[in-house]
């Protein structure tokens, strides 16, 4: 019984099952049925989860369809009736998935009973779900002749069907009060088993009604199925258990798909804090029924009730993120842009290339993020909603390091924010203001105050250049403890500075007693502004001067004790800069007893006001050796009313000039004439690099002096469609300007003696210089021995290399033409142009390093196809020679050049003879032919 999954106990006997098993219902429907249903499911999945990949949606849809298709095939009677009833256009289906999740209306217990009575078991629910998914596709009517043998009479079957349809059509369509019951119950008239009597249906209706009362609002469909299995364990046969396994498998796949889709649903953090809500997991059955009901709709359109006003929510999230991060992001973008501009103004350095690329990439990323934050309300799209979490992550990652607020260390008496700029002097706590310089160490600044107790302590982020020498040796927290915390007062050492003759870098200036006037106070605040760049440049000088100052102090000042009240603390006009890196480890050499490292010592504040012995100023310094440094006071003041610190002005430091500054100065100092000449020379060099020259300046000098049009000078031995660029000819070009020729001549005279000395010591180099000349002589000898009408000779002209001429001397001319040709008296007047018939020799220049470099033609050769050139034998020969040399892949040897010149000259002579009625033997009588005879 367990082996046959298609078998089901029937109250009326097994004959009906045996008759129905003979016909497989899957063979009754259309072949394209499953494909159409699958396409519908995929379409609805894409509408629900448009942000996911298509292959994932297809995979889930195929598994979904396959499971429910296999479940529907297990029922014989239901399957055949499903084929018949699917031909109807309108099916009686009740679907609660169409109602919104928050539109919950009441429906009576009677309605619940009518709905639950339609679903006889969990297996029938699965069949109903699958059959409803197919209900949008029209199926052709199939023959039901085999059912006549199963049922007793057709009339009885029709009556039972009508009763069942009437029972289903009378179900109410009101919306349920339970959100998770949406789509949980769907009943089709074609899915009811005809062998179930109305009495059994009413009995099961009462049972399911009692079960529904015990369910809580918000339970999911799997929980309802679990309760159903617990209350009715005897009604679940093996077949129902198998169907339940399939249902659990489909639900697991749906849960995985919805878990992936939940990535794009980002909730606002502030809304979660103000309105804490528990996120309810979506019921898989709701998703399934939404897809199934949408497939029944003829228009194929559904309304996404869960969407809501997502556009407004997304805009509010972006707006909140913009208010929080856009100022910091804009400041970072401005700093990066300034840094890039500074870097571009400097000469490029190889080590900074990668760093600059990272800066540019970061700048582009910040611009993209700022563009996302500045989106308009009407421009918010689904892309902004889906990508909000990713943008939020990157924005917070960019601004994390910049949004960290520097909080001061909490003291025993109280705590103040760093942004506070004024506080009352009666407070038993002195703050240390933290100022972060540009990529510099953190510094702590002592606040300054006026003489009166009612004045405010102004916290300044910068130092005055006049007060930069005052360095306080303390990096800990400054506070005013009570007498119980520090019962004893420790004497301090006052050191003085030696004379200006030893240092020669600073001078003394006694400060005037400060007046509690508002005008002086404003002037003081204006003069306290300092440039960060000057501070970084002078910090090293101050460290050296401080070390020399303390080490050179030998005489002692009588120890004195000074106690001040917490409400009458007076500081000087300049704050005390704390820098742990520039102070020496141990500086005290006077022998005055001091406290150990890390202990509290007393630093007296110079004030004419009588002090209070119960409230000394204690400075806790955790740094070893730094607590031995005390404030430097002026010992030259003998009045005793006001002791002011010493000031120094460091000597002016040399300013390093940038290359661009030096260029500007040189440009301003030059005369207009020299600038014009420089521009001309630069243009000449650039044009020579960009263009290919074909002529060689035998007289020396620069190209600008020759006045040649280099664009018309083409290289003689250019390759024709060459693939190897390394085969191009190489030659040296003299680019020395004319006005520098005198300097070069003097330099050559000075270097001539040196060259003679070098030549005597390196005689082996002469062999290398002679070797190319010997190779050229050998080639000329071989060429003259092979050619008949062309003679190759070496000229005695002075040049940078060897000049060779190729002369054509025809030997097969008629007597009349030969005499005229040799005499050179054949003159033609064509178009009023005088042209000579004799072919002029070809002049070549072989460099000194030949054969390692190619020879150069010393005259202009161009290809001209005009008519009158046929009468000018020399021009015609050179035109042929120019065209022939372009066909060579590797020109540059004397053998090939001489052979080419010989062939071109002979072809020109033959062409000229044929045009005037002459020619060769072959041209008049025909070429020789090879005749083979059979022996």
From Swiss-Prot:
Region (Disordered): 1-28, 170-190, 495-526, 548-611, 635-654
Role summary: Component of the Mediator complex, a coactivator involved in the regulated transcription of nearly all RNA polymerase II-dependent genes. Mediator functions as a bridge to convey information from gene-specific regulatory proteins to the basal RNA polymerase II transcription machinery. The Mediator complex, having a compact conformation in its free form, is recruited to promoters by direct interactions with regulatory proteins and serves for the assembly of a functional preinitiation complex with RNA polymerase II and the general transcription factors.
InterPro entries linked to this entry: MED15_KIX, MED15a/b/c-like
Family: Belongs to the plant Mediator complex subunit 15 family.
Domain of life where this protein originates: Eukaryota
Species per Swiss-Prot/TrEMBL record: Arabidopsis thaliana
One cellular-component annotation, GO: nucleus
PANTHER family in alphabetical order: MEDIATOR OF RNA POLYMERASE II TRANSCRIPTION SUBUNIT 15A-RELATED, MEDIATOR OF RNA POLYMERASE II TRANSCRIPTION SUBUNIT 15C-RELATED
Subunit structure of this chain's protein: Component of the Mediator complex.
Location(s) in or outside the cell: Nucleus
Amino acid composition bias (Low complexity), ranges on this chain: 511-526
Membrane spanning residue stretches: none
Molecular function GO labels: chromatin DNA binding; transcription coactivator activity
Keywords: Nucleus, Transcription, Transcription regulation
Protein name: Probable mediator of RNA polymerase II transcription subunit 15c
Segments of skewed composition (Polar residues): 1-13, 548-577, 635-644
């Amino acid at each position: 019984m367990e082996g046959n999954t298609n078998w089901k106990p029937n109250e009326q006997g097994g004959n009906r099952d045996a008759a129905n098993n003979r016909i497989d219902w899957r063979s009754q429907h259309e072949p394209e049925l499953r494909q159409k249903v699958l396409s519908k499911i995929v379409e609805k999945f894409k509408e629900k989860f448009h942000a996911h990949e298509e292959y994932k949606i297809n995979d889930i849809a195929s598994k979904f369809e396959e499971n429910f298709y296999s479940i529907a095939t297990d029922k014989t009677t239901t399957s055949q009736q499903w084929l018949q009833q699917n031909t109807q256009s309108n099916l009686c289906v009740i679907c609660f998935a169409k109602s919104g999740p928050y539109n919950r209306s009441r429906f009576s217990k009677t309605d619940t009973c009518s709905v639950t009575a339609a679903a006889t078991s969990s297996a029938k629910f699965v069949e109903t779900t699958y059959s409803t998914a197919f209900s949008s596709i029209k199926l052709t009517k199939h023959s039901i002749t085999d059912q006549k043998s199963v049922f007793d009479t057709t009339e009885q079957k029709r009556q039972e069907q009508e009763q069942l349809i009437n029972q289903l059509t009378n179900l109410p369509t009101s919306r349920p009060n339970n959100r998770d019951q949406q789509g949980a119950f769907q009943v089709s008239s074609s899915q009811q088993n005809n062998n179930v009597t109305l009495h059994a249906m009413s009995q099961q209706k009462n049972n399911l009604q009692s079960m529904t009362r015990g369910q809580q609002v918000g339970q999911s469909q799997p929980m309802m199925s679990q309760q159903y299995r617990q209350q009715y364990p005897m009604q679940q046969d093996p077949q129902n258990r198998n169907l339940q396994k399939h249902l659990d498998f489909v639900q697991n796949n749906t849960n995985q798909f919805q878990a992936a889709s939940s990535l794009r649903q980002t909730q606002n953090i502030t809304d979660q804090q103000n309105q804490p809500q528990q996120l309810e997991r979506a019921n898989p059955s709701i998703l399934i029924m939404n897809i199934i009901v949408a497939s029944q709709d003829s228009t194929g359109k559904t309304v996404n009730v869960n969407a809501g006003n997502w556009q407004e929510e997304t805009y509010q999230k972006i707006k909140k993120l913009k208010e929080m991060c856009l100022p910091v992001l804009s400041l970072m973008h401005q700093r990066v842009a300034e840094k890039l501009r500074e870097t571009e103004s400097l000469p490029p350095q190889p080590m900074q290339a990668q760093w600059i690329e990272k800066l540019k990439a970061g700048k582009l990323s910040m611009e993209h993020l700022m563009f996302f934050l500045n989106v308009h309300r009407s421009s918010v799209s689904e892309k902004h909603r889906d990508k909000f979490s990713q943008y939020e992550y990157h924005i917070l990652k960019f601004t994390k390091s910049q949004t960290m607020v520097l909080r001061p260390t909490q003291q025993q008496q109280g705590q103040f924010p760093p942004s506070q700029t004024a506080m009352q002097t009666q407070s038993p706590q002195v703050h240390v203001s933290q100022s972060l310089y540009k990529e510099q160490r953190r510094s702590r600044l002592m606040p300054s105050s006026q003489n009166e107790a009612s004045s405010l302590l102004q916290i300044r982020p910068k130092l005055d250049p006049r007060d930069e020498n005052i360095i306080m040796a303390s990096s800990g927290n400054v506070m005013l403890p009570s007498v119980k915390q520090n019962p004893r007062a420790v004497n301090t050492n006052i050191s003085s500075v030696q004379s200006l003759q030893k240092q020669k870098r600073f001078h003394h200036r006694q400060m005037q007693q400060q007046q509690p006037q508002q005008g002086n106070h404003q002037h003081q605040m204006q003069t306290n502004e300092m440039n960060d760049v000057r501070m970084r440049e002078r910090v090293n000088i101050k460290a050296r001067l401080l070390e020399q100052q303390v080490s050179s102090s030998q005489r002692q000042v009588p120890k004195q004790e000074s106690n001040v009240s917490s409400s009458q603390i007076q500081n000087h006009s300049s704050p005390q800069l704390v820098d742990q890196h520039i102070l020496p480890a141990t500086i005290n050499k006077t022998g005055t007893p001091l406290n150990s490292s890390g202990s509290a010592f007393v630093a007296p504040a110079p004030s004419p006001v009588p002090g209070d012995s119960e409230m000394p100023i204690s400075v806790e310094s955790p740094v070893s050796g730094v607590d031995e440094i005390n404030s430097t006071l002026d010992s030259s003041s003998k009045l005793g009313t006001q002791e002011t610190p010493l000031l120094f002005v460091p000597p002016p430091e040399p300013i390093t000039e940038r290359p661009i500054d030096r260029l500007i100065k040189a440009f301003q100092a030059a005369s207009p004439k020299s600038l014009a000449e420089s521009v001309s020379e630069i243009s000449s060099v650039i044009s020579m690099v960009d263009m290919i020259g074909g002529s060689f300046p035998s007289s020396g000098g620069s190209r600008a002096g020759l006045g040649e049009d280099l664009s018309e000078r083409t290289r003689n031995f250019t390759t024709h469609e060459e693939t190897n660029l390394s085969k191009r000819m190489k030659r040296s070009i003299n680019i020395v300007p004319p006005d520098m020729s005198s300097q070069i001549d003097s330099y050559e005279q000075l270097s001539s003696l040196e060259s003679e000395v070098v030549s005597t010591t390196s005689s082996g180099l002469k062999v290398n210089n002679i070797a190319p000349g010997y190779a050229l002589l050998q080639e000329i000898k071989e060429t003259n021995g092979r050619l008949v009408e062309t003679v190759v000779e070496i000229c005695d002209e002075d040049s940078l290399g060897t000049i060779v001429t190729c002369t054509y001397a025809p030997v097969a001319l008629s007597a009349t033409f030969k005499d005229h040709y040799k005499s050179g008296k054949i003159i033609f007047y064509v178009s009023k142009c005088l042209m000579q018939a004799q072919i002029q020799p070809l002049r070549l220049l072989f460099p000194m390093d030949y054969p390692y470099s190619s020879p150069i033609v010393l005259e202009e050769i161009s290809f001209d196809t005009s008519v009158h050139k046929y009468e000018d034998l020399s021009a015609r020969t050179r035109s042929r020679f120019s065209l022939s040399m372009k066909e060579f892949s590797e020109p540059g040897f004397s053998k090939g050049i001489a052979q080419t010149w010989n062939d071109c000259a002979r072809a020109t002579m033959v062409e000229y003879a044929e045009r005037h009625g002459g020619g060769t033997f072959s041209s008049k009588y025909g070429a020789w032919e090879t005749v083979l005879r059979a022996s």
